[in-house]
Every structure is written in structure tokens, then in C-alpha cells.
Design a protein with these regions (language model features):
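Conserved small/polar residues in nucleotide/adenosyl-binding loops
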Residues: 183-189
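N-terminal glycine/serine-rich phosphate-binding loop of ATP-dependent small-molecule kinases
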Residues: 1-32, 164
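Adenine-nucleotide phosphate-binding core of ATP-dependent small-molecule kinases
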Residues: 122-152
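Glycine-rich phosphate-binding loop plus the immediately following alpha-helix
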Residues: 65-108
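Short helix-loop-beta connector
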Residues: 4-5, 44-47, 161-163
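Generic long, charged, amphipathic alpha-helical segments
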Residues: 153-160, 167, 172
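Conserved phosphate-binding catalytic cores of ATP/NTP-utilizing and phosphoryl-transfer enzymes
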Residues: 17-54, 59-66, 70, 154-157
Length: 190
């Protein structure tokens, strides 16, 4: 912060928001899903679906007539979250930037499915044994993140049911390979 800056109001959201509010004497706390909805509505007033993929969890918020209709969270597995991608990149001595760079230029992403971390790791090892490139595995992992979100969290069979105004949130979408995978799997083909 600039030296003369003054904090006039503060807010907190996420896991343990009430505890943090009390401990740090924060002015306001908000339930995370409501914060997601409020932010999405600010940027896309006609939002129909919100997909949040963070480092540790995923959320899908379905909206109907401008109100939250349903909220779905990932279960115990974190295979579709940012921390899993980061761990995978580090295991190959890759930075996230290099992971993305390799994934984006892949010509044949490996189909890793959308299973939990333990199964995903074994599929990755199998793909390595079969001679797939780091880029193809990275691209496959990016696709698996989105497949996991669509199939296991959102439980969507037809992506057109997401509506026309989808807002994506969460740090995992800063990964261009994941964002491109999301676009390929959810936008209608012409």
C-alpha cells in the first residue's frame, strides 16, 4: 500500500470467514458463494452459471431468474483443482508457465479421464511409459480438470444447460491451458 493509504473498511470471505472477522476485527464477512454470485453479477448481469475452480476446491452455482438455484461442490477429491496441477508441474521440474506453454502447443492431449488424484497419477505414469510428451500430458491434465468439473461437480450431461452467460472464477482459470480446455469442452461447435 502507498504510505498515505488508509484502510477505511475491510471484508473477508471464504472458509472460516467469521473466525477471521473476529480475530482481525474485520468490518464485514460474507459467505463465499454469495461473494461469488455478487462478483459474477457485477461483471455479467445476466449470469446463468458460475464455475469456480480454486487451488483446493471447485464450486458450481446455477442461477435461475436472477437467483441462486443450486450450489454444488466437489467431494473429497482435489484432482480437478489448481494445487494438483501445480504439484504435477513441480514433479516434472516445470514452472506453471512452462506447463501452460507445453500444454497449449500439444497436438494430441492424453485422455486422463476425470478420476481422483490417485488414479490420475497412475494414468499419468502410464502415459509417460507410453512415450507421450510433457505437453500432451499437460494438455490432457488441463482437459481432465474441466471434465472433472463438468462430470463430477456440475453433473452436467449437456453443456448447453449451463446457459449463455457463464462466469468462470478462481485462480485455476489463470492457467491458459485450463481456460482453453474449458472453452473447447463447453462452447458449441459450429
Amino acid at each position: 500500500l502507498p504510505p498515505k493509504a488508509k484502510i477505511r473498511f475491510s471484508g473477508v470471505t471464504g472458509y472460516g470467514e467469521k473466525l477471521i472477522q473476529t480475530a482481525l476485527n474485520v468490518d464485514l464477512n460474507e459467505i463465499e458463494t454469495i461473494a461469488h454470485y455478487t462478483a459474477a453479477k457485477k461483471f455479467q448481469p445476466n449470469v446463468t452459471s458460475i464455475v469456480d475452480i480454486g487451488g483446493q476446491d471447485m464450486k458450481y452455482i446455477r442461477l435461475k431468474n436472477g437467483a441462486i438455484d443450486n450450489i454444488m461442490l466437489n467431494e473429497a477429491c482435489s484432482s480437478g483443482c489448481g494445487s494438483f496441477i501445480e504439484t504435477f508441474a513441480k514433479s516434472l521440474n516445470l514452472s506453471i508457465e512452462k506447463f501452460v506453454e507445453e500444454a497449449i502447443v500439444s497436438k494430441r492431449p492424453v485422455d486422463l479421464g476425470s478420476r481422483c488424484t490417485v488414479f490420475m497419477n497412475s494414468k499419468i505414469k502410464q502415459a509417460q511409459k507410453e512415450g507421450y510428451s510433457v505437453g500432451d500430458i499437460s494438455a490432457g491434465l488441463s482437459y481432465s480438470v474441466i471434465k472433472n468439473a463438468i462430470q463430477k461437480v456440475m453433473k452436467v450431461r449437456d453443456v448447453s444447460t449451463l446457459g449463455e452467460h457463464i462466469v468462470v472464477q478462481g485462480g485455476t482459470f489463470y492457467n491458459d491451458a485450463v481456460s482453453v480446455s474449458y472453452t473447447h469442452l463447453t462452447l458449441p461447435t459450429t
